[in-house]
Amino acid sequence: MVHPFLFLEFLRKMLAPLHLSEASADAVSYTWLIIALLLLLSFLATRALKTVPGGLQNFMEIIVGGIENMVTETMGEHGRPYFPLVATIGIFVLVSNLIGLIPGFFPPTANINTTAACAIVVFLSTHVVGIKRHGIGYIKHFCGPILWLTPIMFFIEVIGHLSRPVSLTLRLFGNMNGHELVLIIFFGLAPFLVPLPMMLMGVLVSFIQAFVFMLLTMIYIQGSLEEAH
């Protein structure tokens, strides 16, 4: 759902030659804005690293350290190589969710194209990791433990794996787009202060959805690393 007044309205006009819908143009604009903000924050936090961190460096270390601990607790030590992927997706989804709470801003995750792109990255990464780890033996993950049931199990497993990006896409999109709709309705029907509790709930929803997306990413990658039985 598009806000009546958009902070990056001018970018919609710049993207007009691409013949994107208004919602897609807004999602692209705010996606690039979020990428720029995250790059700027990373630069500012790391340009003068200190042994005893403070300010922005301390804040970023808390976030990165928390995600790293979550990765190692969920996947074990062998999950560390995949920490950058999990952290990048998690932080991007979280900031994309939260930015929609600012009046005039649009959350890219309320557009199905953005959530689908994130889900496809997770889907492809999962299978690339599995093939890299097991080689041709990765196919055993789809065959099941009983040889004569292999054709049936293969079909079921393929459907199950294909449903993963669909569920990731629709879960995040549905929650964030639904929240946008509710906020717009409340702001249209009630004074400014009345919708504030809904905005506070939006903060909680934003964190939960980012956490769920990261958790499922780790579970899927962990599954591809395990030996087939």
UniProtKB/Swiss-Prot annotation:
Any one Pfam family match given in the protein's UniProt record, by short name: ATP-synt_A
Subcellular location: Cell inner membrane
Membrane-spanning intervals of the chain: 25-45, 86-106, 111-131, 142-162, 181-201, 202-222
Domain of life of the native organism: Bacteria
Coiled coil: none
One annotated Gene Ontology cellular component of this protein: proton-transporting ATP synthase complex
Keyword Transmembrane: yes
Keyword Transcription attributed: no
Keywords annotated in UniProt: ATP synthesis, Cell inner membrane, Cell membrane, CF(0), Hydrogen ion transport, Ion transport, Membrane, Transmembrane, Transmembrane helix, Transport
Topological type in the membrane: Multi-pass membrane protein
SUPFAM superfamilies in alphabetical order: F1F0 ATP synthase subunit A
Annotated GO biological process: proton motive force-driven plasma membrane ATP synthesis
GO molecular function: proton-transporting ATP synthase activity, rotational mechanism
Family: Belongs to the ATPase A chain family.
Family annotation (PANTHER family): ATP SYNTHASE SUBUNIT A, CHLOROPLASTIC
Biological role: Key component of the proton channel; it plays a direct role in the translocation of protons across the membrane.
Assembly mode: F-type ATPases have 2 components, CF(1) - the catalytic core - and CF(0) - the membrane proton channel. CF(1) has five subunits: alpha(3), beta(3), gamma(1), delta(1), epsilon(1). CF(0) has three main subunits: a(1), b(2) and c(9-12). The alpha and beta chains form an alternating ring which encloses part of the gamma chain. CF(1) is attached to CF(0) by a central stalk formed by the gamma and epsilon chains, while a peripheral stalk is formed by the delta and b chains.
Record HAMAP family: ATP_synth_a_bact
Annotated protein name in UniProt: ATP synthase subunit a 3
Organism: Pelobacter propionicus (strain DSM 2379 / NBRC 103807 / OttBd1)
